[in-house]
């Protein structure tokens, strides 16, 4: 090694090391961004599925409970299952619209940055 024990490190070697490290960091960041985008889309897909299923479940629960109270066995359950489905679809479509708006804003910001 070119440095003495307890001496200062060689500035040229440090600069070369920093340059190599920065190049390695740049090559590692590119795949990570693509993976983050895929994860974000998968998260949104699961969110939409959960919204739809929870709407159905809540509608079923309300309908079943009201049927048990009033003794109108399948009637209110069917009505509230369809209402829950409609509510779940409405919330799911709103989430899809928000995602579309966010992607449009990101695309517009990307074009302005270039």
UniProtKB/Swiss-Prot annotation:
The chain crosses the membrane at residues 48-68, 69-89. GO terms for cellular component: plasma membrane-derived chromatophore membrane; proton-transporting ATP synthase complex. It is a multi-pass membrane protein. Pfam families: ATPase_gene1. One of its GO terms (biological process) is proton transmembrane transport. It is found in: Cellular chromatophore membrane. InterPro entries: Atp1_alphaprobac, ATPase_put. Its main location: membrane. Keywords: CF(0), Hydrogen ion transport, Ion transport, Membrane, Transmembrane, Transmembrane helix, Transport. A possible function for this protein is to guide the assembly of the membrane sector of the ATPase enzyme complex. Belongs to the bacterial AtpI family. F-type ATPases have 2 components, CF(1) - the catalytic core - and CF(0) - the membrane proton channel. CF(1) has five subunits: alpha(3), beta(3), gamma(1), delta(1), epsilon(1). CF(0) has four main subunits: a, b, b' and c. This is ATP synthase protein I.
């Amino acid at each position: 090694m070119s440095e003495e024990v307890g001496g200062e490190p060689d500035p040229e070697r440090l600069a070369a090391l920093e340059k190599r490290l920065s190049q390695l960091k740049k090559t590692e960041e590119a795949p990570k961004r693509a993976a983050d985008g895929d994860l974000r889309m998968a998260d949104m897909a699961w969110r939409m599925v959960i919204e739809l299923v929870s709407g159905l479940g809540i509608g079923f629960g309300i309908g079943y409970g009201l049927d048990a109270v009033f003794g109108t066995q399948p009637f209110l359950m069917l009505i509230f299952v369809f209402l829950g489905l409609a509510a779940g679809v409405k919330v799911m479509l709103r989430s899809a619209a928000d995602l579309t708006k966010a992607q449009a804003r990101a695309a517009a910001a990307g074009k302005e940055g270039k």
